[in-house]
Amino acid sequence: MKLCYHCMSQISNDKASTCPVCGKSLDPEEQKPRFLKPGTVLGGKFIAGYHLGSGGFGNTYIGWDQVLQRKVAIKEFYPEQYCGRGQDGLTVVVTDERLISRYQRGLQQFLVEARNVAALHDVQGVVEISNFFEENGTGYIIMEYLEGMDVKTILKKSGNKKDYEWSRRVILTVLYTLKEVHKRGVLHRDIAPDNIFVTKEGIVKLIDFGAAKNVTVMDSSKDVWLKSGYAPIEQYRNTFEQGPYTDLYAVAALFYRMLTGQKPIPAVD
């Protein structure tokens, strides 16, 4: 029995060269150095497959939980501005010694945020986190594997905007979810089209909570990270207090984006 590292389907025919489920080649494909080699085992039981996506602060892979025998998503802390992959193809190393402390702060915040979100397992509208740990000089979060698309992709496929009823349903679900999240003392801090996911069943989920990004920006003069148009004024200064209203501003901007097809005006303007 072997796995397709593209879709994590189990394949009984050891001689198969293509996956009968997704149709992709089972032969190894060359990866960029920033990504883990498919088949890498993390935490002693999670197999990393090919990467699903990457951003300035991390890599996300499809994965397989060998104990529970199910697909998962694996998020790796990887602030690309100042880290790279070691010669072993596993270890994440900081390329500038002057930035090690900043990297470590970001890593610890990444894990703290994972713990906070994992505690929200009973909130349906939040992606479920089942495990998180440090390994290879970095951190990993094991999440439920979601099938569907984020709102950013949906908008691209829908002429850059959606109708009122669809947008209203998504926004109301996000608001209800945030109400429950805020009751637990947790802020999302990164509400935007790419962090709202709609599953194939139509379930709306919040993904990618943004606290760790706030301490891993390259500009050492300010410890903030934001998305222009969605970030309220208090996110532009690390001395300004943030609260539930920070997320609500971003939700309003998101609603505007979905209905008009236009990017919201930056708060500083």
Regions found by a protein language model. Give the residues of each.
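Conserved short submotifs of the Hanks-type protein kinase catalytic core
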Residues: 136-150, 154
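Activation-segment/catalytic-loop signature of the eukaryotic protein kinase fold
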Residues: 131-132
